[in-house]
Amino acid sequence: MAARALRRFHSGLIVRFVSNVDAADLDAALEGLNPQRTLFIVSSKTFTTLETMHNAERARAWVLAAGIDWTSRFAAATANPGAAVAWGIPAEQTFEFFDWVGGRFSLSSVIGLPLMCAIGVDRFNEMLQGMRDMDDHVLSASPATNLPIMHALTWFVNAVLLQLPTVAVVPYSHDLSRLPAFLQQLVMESNGKGVAHDGGALPHGTSPVVWGEPGTNGQHAFFQMLHQGTQIVPVEFVSTVAPLGDDLIAHDLLIANMIAQAEALAAGSTSEDPQQRFSGNRPNTVIMLERLDAHSLGALVAMYEHSTAVQGWLMGVNSFDQFGVELGKSMAKIAANAIEKGEADSAQTMTHPLMEWFLHHRQYNS
């Protein structure tokens, strides 16, 4: 997300990210690259995540196939440096962060090393300063003028008190096109919990479903539902005052569309024809940055991080665990072992027929 948002400030290095265990992801990232001029940064908190380590093994094999000392082409960002060294990465090329830093809150840690490579040290420090400025604002501002607190209250009221189960994040800035996906993990992994932080029952709902696409594209996809659908969906618009390029007319049209959508959602429109009637009263918020740069992006990310934590506190959940993710990892190990053995595991009580079907039909191209 951040590398995409700050692509106009890239230093000249080609930086590609691989997160999916689907082989197509790594294949696409390696396309056109020279092993002698490629550095891999393996980013893993535990250095045991199956997807990450499988991709790392494949990347290492790719370097070895070129007859190169692979250890000179790898670095690690991890909270478990011992595991990285045991895997073969030299200690001096292993960058450690605290084990209490969750992945979704780790952009400002050494996990941000690839971003630093992309935009340069100075720009990365500007992003960190933007985060620190937002941190200082949170600590010093009164609740009534505290941006993360006000933002958290807005999302909490919509999701919990008004019981509106989703929120659409629509950046009217194409370089922020990955912001909705970033917030999906930040918000839903943090606050998508079914019990209180003490293990007790919750008397209310928790995290909304976060989704979205950049404007104006979304206007021609899901905005019809936002305006006239039976399910009310809060919308969060994010944009910038200053354009990113030289086309001022295009930027003015972009902002005009955003403001028009905010007005239409809030005010609606009357008509004798019920098909053309808009009820309005559809909640929406607008976040405007002066410009999209490293400092403002850092402040924006920190604002969302603080807001997420405040929402979790209001909901009474622990925003800093993710046992649902851990369950998926453990079940994936059982499924992977079953595929390796060619026999469905008895522990797969609900998906036993599916595993048997897959094992019967699976084929690999030679």
Predicted regions and their residues:
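Short beta->alpha connector loops at strand-helix junctions that form conserved
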Residues: 18-19, 44, 95-100
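Glycine-rich oxoanion-binding loops at beta->alpha junctions
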Residues: 2-39
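C-terminal helical/tail subdomains of lipid-metabolizing enzymes
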Residues: 285-342, 348-365
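Acidic, Ser/Thr-rich peripheral helices and adjacent loops at domain boundaries
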Residues: 244-276
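Non-catalytic terminal/interface segments that mediate subunit docking, oligomerization
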Residues: 1, 5-14, 195, 229-236
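Extended, hydrophobic alpha-helical segments in both membrane/secreted and soluble proteins
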Residues: 1-2, 26, 42-45, 49-63, ...
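Short glycine-rich or small-residue beta-strand-to-loop segments that form or flank ligand, phosphate
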Residues: 40-46, 166-173, 209, 287-290
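Active-site phosphate/pyrophosphate-binding segments
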Residues: 62-247, 327-333, 340-365
